[in-house]
Amino acid sequence: IAVSRRDIGDAQVGDCVAVEVTSYGDDTYHPQGVVSAALGENGTMEASIAAILHENGVFDVFPDEVLKQADAIPQQVDLASAGKRLDLRDKLIFTIDGDDAKDFDDAVSLEKLDNGHYLLGVHIADVSHYVTPDSPLDSEAFRRGTSVYFPGHVVPMLPFALSNGICSLNPNVDRLAFSALMEMDASGRRYGARFSKSIIRSKARMTYNKVNKILAGDKGLREEYAFLVETAEKMNDLAHALYKRRIERGALELDIPEAEIRVDEAGKPVEICFRERGESEKLIEEFMLQANEAVA
């Protein structure tokens, strides 16, 4: 495609660009076009990601009206406008995510009841409190549909002020959530469930790696997180019971290895390996399944 010098915009020699065809030419002329976007120096990680996003209609930049609405949302919970909610801030609730996770949208809890049963809690960030129907944020989230993840890079469905801020269940701060509270015995049998808008305060930002090491007996981590070790062990026991019950019911288990692309500090891929799936990953999987089954 031939592009005139006057139609290259801000692009530089060696850049990766997107070109809009203005004429497809004929037997004697090449197609003609104009540079519609300069995506960065060709061959770099940034340009490669930008090209994939552009090709698939995914936009890294949010419209001004969306950012304006997001920036106007306070980064602290306003109890006066939160409405009637179940106050769970004194409960031992914590998140478990990957080492590189920046947004924490779910948390878990487990407590022993007087009748010997357990109360399993799955707490999901209440984004709907901040993203109201037909607002600019709502329309943009609907248009995007999902967050798009690359190794070392994410294009969020919602601006970072929400996804990494007030809608992220960060530790030691109040957050609005929607909680599924399920009563079950040690064998994983569920006796009932209730659902409520809630306010929580996560007590720790845990990672799969740390919880796996705690469950494996890592002395240093067990001392550092002594306040949740017993709960983590009981969670693991319950997760095993839930898995056993699920398999006995005829669940189809597709334990397919997941590839993990590791990048260096510059964001360049340096290794492709199988993602390890330890006890904590399975624990979260079982608890989320329980919450979904209870809701259904």
Language-model-detected regions and their locations in the chain:
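Charge-lined substrate channels and their catalytic hotspots, especially those that engage the 3′ end
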Residues: 1-121, 128-173, 212
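Short hinge/gating elements
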Residues: 1-5, 23, 37, 220-225, ...
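Short coil/turn segments at secondary-structure boundaries
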Residues: 50, 64-68, 86-89, 192-196, ...
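Short acidic-glycine loop/turn motifs at beta-strand connectors
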Residues: 112-114, 184-189, 263-267
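Conserved phosphate/anionic-ligand binding catalytic regions in large, soluble enzymes, centered on
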Residues: 118-131, 282-293
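Conserved catalytic alpha/beta cores of large enzymes that bind or transform nucleotide phosphates
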Residues: 147-248
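Conserved pre-motif C helix in the palm subdomain of viral-like polymerases
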Residues: 227-241, 277-294
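Core structural elements
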Residues: 246-270, 286-294
